[in-house]
C-alpha cells in the first residue's frame, strides 16, 4: 500500500479510538475486541489461541486482503494490575505488555489513535454487605418483561439479553459472583479475597452501533 493510500486507510478508521471511547465515558472493561490497519503492527505472526502464551491475549490475526489486523484482549493481560480492569489509564500498559512478552510488535501510539473497538464488555463491581447469592437468587426469580430473555450463567449467576436476532442490536447483561468465578478459573492474576462478596456486572456490546447507543459516543 502506498503512503498516501495508507494514510487514507488510517483516516477511514478514526471512529472509536481508545482515548475518545475511554475518556468520555470513563468506562472499565473486562474485554475489548479491536481491529486496526496493518500499519499499526510492525510485526504480527498469526497465532492460534494455544500458541499465544500470554494470558489475556485471546486471539490475534492479520487479514492481508482487507489490510487489517484483529486482536481480542481481556483484563488478564494486565497481570498483577488485573483488578483495575481495562481502562483509559492502563490500556497503553496492556498493549506494551504484548510487545514485551510475545513476538508481536505493535505501534502502540498508532493503535491507540486508529484502532477501532468492535466489541466491549463494560464492567463494574458491586461490593455487597451480604452473600452475593441472595442478590443473584432474587434476580433469577423476579418477573421480567417478555422481550427480555433470562438464562442461567454457570448455575449460580444470571444473564439477561434481548431477543433481537440481529447481533448489531442485541445486548447481554450478566451478573455473577466474582469470587466464585475467580475460584473456578483459578485466576493467577490476583488474590481471591479481593473479590469476596463482589457481584460483577458486565454489559456485552458486540457492534459499533450498540457501543455508540449505550455509551453515548
Feature annotation, model-predicted:
Residues 1-217:
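Structured, helix-rich domain cores that form ligand/interaction pockets
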Amino acid at each position: 500500500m502506498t503512503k498516501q493510500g495508507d494514510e487514507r486507510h488510517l483516516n477511514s478508521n478514526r471512529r472509536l479510538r481508545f482515548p475518545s471511547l475511554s475518556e468520555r465515558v470513563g468506562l472499565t472493561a473486562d474485554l475489548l475486541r479491536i481491529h486496526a490497519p496493518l500499519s499499526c503492527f510492525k510485526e504480527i505472526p498469526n497465532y492460534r489461541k494455544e500458541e499465544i502464551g500470554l494470558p489475556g491475549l485471546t486471539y490475534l490475526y492479520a487479514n492481508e486482503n482487507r489490510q487489517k489486523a484483529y486482536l481480542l484482549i481481556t483484563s488478564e493481560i494486565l497481570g498483577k494490575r488485573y483488578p483495575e480492569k481495562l481502562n483509559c489509564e492502563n490500556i497503553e500498559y496492556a498493549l506494551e505488555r504484548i510487545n514485551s512478552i510475545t513476538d508481536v510488535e505493535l505501534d502502540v501510539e498508532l493503535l491507540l489513535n486508529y484502532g477501532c473497538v468492535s466489541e466491549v464488555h463494560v464492567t463494574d463491581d458491586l461490593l455487597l454487605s451480604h452473600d452475593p447469592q441472595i442478590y443473584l437468587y432474587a434476580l433469577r426469580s423476579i418477573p421480567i418483561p417478555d422481550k427480555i430473555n433470562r438464562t442461567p450463567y454457570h448455575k449460580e449467576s444470571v444473564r439477561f439479553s434481548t431477543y433481537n436476532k440481529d447481533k448489531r442490536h442485541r445486548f447481554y447483561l450478566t451478573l455473577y459472583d466474582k469470587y466464585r468465578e475467580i475460584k473456578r478459573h483459578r485466576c493467577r492474576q490476583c488474590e481471591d479475597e479481593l473479590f469476596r462478596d463482589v457481584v460483577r456486572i458486565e454489559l456485552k456490546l458486540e457492534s459499533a452501533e450498540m457501543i455508540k447507543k449505550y455509551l453515548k459516543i
